[in-house]
Every structure is written in C-alpha cells, then in structure tokens.
Amino acid sequence: MQLQRLGAPLLKRLVGGCIRQSTAPIMPCVVVSGSGGFLTPVRTYMPLPNDQSDFSPYIEIDLPSESRIQSLHKSGLAAQEWVACEKVHGTNFGIYLINQGDHEVVRFAKRSGIMDPNENFFGYHILIDEFTAQIRILNDLLKQKYGLSRVGRLVLNGELFGAKYKHPLVPKSEKWCTLPNGKKFPIAGVQIQREPFPQYSPELHFFAFDIKYSVSGAEEDFVLLGYDEFVEFSSKVPNLLYARALVRGTLDECLAFDVENFMTPLPALLGLGNYPLEGNLAEGVVIRHVRRGDPAVEKHNVSTIIKLRCSSFMELKHPGKQKELKETFIDTVRSGALRRVRGNVTVISDSMLPQVEAAANDLLLNNVSDGRLSNVLSKIGREPLLSGEVSQVDVALMLAKDALKDFLKEVDSLVLNTTLAFRKLLITNVYFESKRLVEQKWKELMQEEAAAQSEAIPPLSPAAPTKGE
C-alpha cells in the first residue's frame, strides 16, 4: 500500500477508529512511521474464534543437528528411503473439511488456529472457491480408496505464498480479494515475505505438503499419509500444486543436496520461465522419511522430518546466523553426508520441471551412456590414462562435453529458447551424470586398460648367449 500524507483531522479519525474497533475483523491500525506526517498501515489480526476444537496444529520442523542425524543413523532409519522437497517461503496454511453430522463445512487455519471467516489473512479468500473444490475432491478420493463411508476431519496442510515478483516485464497482480463482509483488498498489496528472495509469482498460490485425516474426527485418530500416498492423492486433485521429490534416496543422499546453489523452479512451473530473476535462490528443502507417520517408523522416537535452509537465506532472515549455520550444518552434518556418499552432490531431478524442460533433461542425460564413454576413452588413448596424464575428472568433463555437443545437434528449438537458468541447470546435470558414470566404471576401466596393455607388449626374448658361455 502506497504511503499517503494525512492531515490531522483524518489522522485523528483513523487512530480513534482503530482504538475503538480494535477487534473488528479487518480494520488495519494506522501508526506514524518516519517524519513529515507519513503513515503506514500495520496489520492487526482479529482474535481467533473461541472454539478451536477442530484445529489440529502443524508441528515445528527441526533443523538437522549432528545429534539428530546420529540418532537417525543409530535407529537404522537413515539407511531407508527419504525425500527432499523444496521448502517454500510463505506462511503456514491449512484447509479443513469437517463433518458435522448432517453436513460438511470447510474452514481455513493459520499456524495458531482456525480463523474467523472475515479475517484478512494475506488475501487467501481469492482462492476459497478453488480450495473448497479441492478439499471435497480429496475427501471423495480418500473414501473411495479406503472404503470409508465418512471422514470426520480432513486436513490439507501447506504454504500460502506468492504475491511478489519484481521483474520489469512482469506486471503486478490486478486481482482483488473480497471478504464475506464485502471488504476488498488488492493482491498487489499483500506482503507475505519481506526478503528479496525467493520470489515466485505476482499472484497468490498454495503449495500442499501434507494430508492427514481422522475417520472419527478425534485428534488421537489422525492418520498422516506417507509421501507416496500423498503424491498419489495430490496428483488427482485438479490444479493442486504440491511438494514433489527433488531427491529420493537415503538420508545422506538427501542431505547431500546442493541447497546452497538451488534456484527455485517454482516461477517456471507457474508460467514465468521466460522471466527469471537473478539469484532467486530457494529458501531450502524439507527432508522427510517416505513413511513418516507410520507407527513402525515413529516408534524410534526420533524426528522423521527436518529442514535445510541455504546460508544466504538464513543471513537475510536471521542476520548473523550465517556463520552459525556453517559451523552447525555445512561443516558438520552436510560434510559428513558428503563423505558417506563419496562426494556425490545430489542434483535436482526433472520432477519439478515443466514438460518441455523435463523432456530435454531426460534426453540430455540419455546421451551419457557406456557407449559414449567408450568412444571418449578411445579418443584419449591408453597411455595418457594409465600414466595419469588424463585424470578421472578430465574424463568426466570430456564425456559431459561430448554428450552436450550431440544433444545440441538434435534438440528442438523449443529447448534452445528456454530460460538461461534452465540451460545452466542442464549443463550442471550432464556434468554430474557424467561424473557419476565415470566414478562407477573407473576401477573396471583402468583394470581393462592395464590388461590390454600387458597383452600388447610382447614377452622379452631370452638373451643370446655370449662367447665363452
């Protein structure tokens, strides 16, 4: 909202009105900021409804301290399957479907509780029709899958995000949010985040990351869907943006994800692929056990969900924390994970990429093959390999360049017109795929080359006898 110069009479009316109506649903309290009589609006949230019996809080996610990671290794859970998904920077938001006997009601919650329908919480009302349809479809899918006649409470947890994308060619949102009481607010005035990155879209969006339900409606009967079930259901709900795996593997493979250089792919998924923002790093990733919530997993009494934040974001959010993060995670937890996975930095999969880009990524990585590696080795020759003149790293780089060269010859022009950020991602992916293949084959290749060299050298002939022998 743009600052305005307000005269004393208007100031008196505004401040007085704000004091008199401090519990009104959407009255913003106006306070003096700076000099010269300029005012800026400050959001005042209305009280939560007294009855919070239907509210089911979402847990705070732990940071990956060394002791937590050690506990997971000792329990045996670290060696099982985990997924790392993007951590979206927004505000916690829950969509509820509550069975009240003769009918079902849809309610909405922030982290602290279910909201009054007239609370202006970051403009979410603009998405209510879509949310209502999605939670009802999800309810029907659950009942069909599990043969249920009713579901007492269903909760779709996620993140409300967006309403900010500062690119010169991308206009601000022109949409307005209308509350049940008729009050209207522009989406362009919503400010979920203050940090300069990550930015996602000028429009408001929702990113789902968990589904839980209770047949009876009681809190103790809630069932949290495992990751695979979550994806199965979410993928069938129209227009639902949900957490997809960037990495799937052991805990160490997820911890080895290069969170420090991870650019958020969400703008491209939301149609802004041609308008990238420089340095638009993701906040980080959330890593969770694929069967989180399963009693067999939770019986170990250790955290089965953790979050990683990139140090650049941490410095913005909590100034002075970058050094602490480096000492408590990057130099300890992550370096330990990298050692255990032999230095293989985990690269983003194509699961978060738009269709054309995902196809291009697959096509390029298919070019990294055993046959191409053999061709590269034949060009190098045996002697440089055995002498160490050409190293394992050199071979990986040559393989990546060769794969990229042929890929560019045959690729569709659509790919050449993708964003610079995606083209950089392609180069990174082909290098790490080449590095992985060379590391996997290196010992065997060197043994074969050494054996071939031995066969190629003729055995020494017995020396001719000298005179007198």
From Swiss-Prot:
Subcellular location(s) of the protein: Mitochondrion
Source domain of life: Eukaryota
Entry's EC annotation: 6.5.1.3
Residues covered by region (Disordered): 450-469
GO cellular component: cytoplasm; kinetoplast; mitochondrial mRNA editing complex; mitochondrion
Active site, UniProt feature: K87 (n6-amp-lysine intermediate)
Keyword list, A-Z: ATP-binding, Ligase, Mitochondrion, mRNA processing, Nucleotide-binding, RNA-binding, Transit peptide
Span of chain positions assigned to the transit peptide in the UniProt entry: 1-44
Ranges in a coiled coil: none
Binding, ATP: 59-61, 86-92, 111, 159, 209, 307-309
Reaction equation(s) it catalyzes: ATP + (ribonucleotide)n-3'-hydroxyl + 5'-phospho-(ribonucleotide)m = (ribonucleotide)n+m + AMP + diphosphate
One MF annotation (Gene Ontology) recorded for this entry: RNA ligase (ATP) activity
A GO BP annotation: mRNA processing
Subunit and interaction comment: Component of the RNA editing complex (editosome), a 1600 kDa complex composed of at least 20 proteins. Interacts with terminal uridylyltransferase MEAT1.
Chain's role: Essential for RNA editing. RNA editing in kinetoplastid mitochondria inserts and deletes uridylates at multiple sites in pre-mRNAs as directed by guide RNAs.
Family (UniProt): Belongs to the RNA ligase 2 family.
Name of the protein this chain belongs to: RNA-editing ligase 1, mitochondrial
Record organism: Trypanosoma brucei brucei (strain 927/4 GUTat10.1)
